[in-house]
């Protein structure tokens, strides 16, 4: 009999999940191809490093910001970020703690939540990094991966939905205008919209 994972065990399941990472990387690659500028957030430094190594092929520039770097190194990385030309495609990979108050890079228009978070303030803070005026920015999109097979993360997702609704976000269709489906019991249309109705 298998047991339901909790705590660090639950995070380990998604942190070291190649299929899940492949899904995220495919979405990031499509995002860059569509001319968007994504930031991918994860809770773990090793996860950020692993994803950044595999994602660098998809953009002209990839910049990794993690809490493992000293202050001097982080300043150099921020300088590198600010030096990226508008004509260059860019992927920013970071640990969530580094995108707190004071971080400002208006070009970002797409957020990838590579590990689950909960708490209205955290969601508002992360999404707030995208809500900056920038020439040519038409909208902002959040990719939120629903780990519904793990009860802990399913509850966290429900909490995030409430936060998204509070700050005015809507359920999104894919970039080609079609509802995106997943090979699971619920696709994004039925699963998320059911939650959305529950919040009304």
Q: Where are the predicted features?
A:
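Conserved interdomain hinge at the start of the Helicase C-terminal
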Residues: 1-54
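Conserved nucleotide-binding/hydrolysis micro-motifs of P-loop NTPases
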Residues: 45-47, 70, 98-100, 116-120, ...
């Amino acid at each position: 009999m298998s047991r339901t994972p909790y705590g660090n065990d639950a995070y380990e399941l998604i942190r070291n999940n190649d299929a899940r990472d492949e899904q995220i990387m495919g979405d990031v690659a499509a995002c860059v191809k569509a001319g968007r500028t994504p930031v991918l957030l994860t809770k773990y430094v090793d996860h950020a490093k692993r994803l950044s190594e595999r994602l660098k092929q998809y953009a002209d520039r990839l910049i990794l910001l993690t809490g493992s770097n000293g202050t001097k190194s982080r300043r150099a990385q921020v300088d590198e970020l600010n030096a990226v030309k508008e004509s260059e495609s860019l992927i920013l990979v970071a640990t969530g703690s580094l995108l707190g108050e004071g971080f400002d890079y208006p070009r970002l228009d797409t957020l990838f939540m590579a590990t689950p978070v909960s708490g209205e303030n955290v969601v508002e803070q992360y999404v707030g990094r995208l809500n900056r005026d920038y020439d040519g920015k038409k909208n902002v999109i959040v990719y939120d991966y629903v780990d519904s097979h793990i009860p802990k993360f399913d509850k966290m997702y429900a909490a995030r939905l409430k936060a998204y609704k509070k700050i005015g976000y809507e359920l999104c269709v894919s970039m080609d205008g079609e509802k995106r489906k997943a090979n699971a019991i619920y696709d994004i249309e039925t699963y998320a919209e059911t939650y959305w109705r529950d919040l009304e």
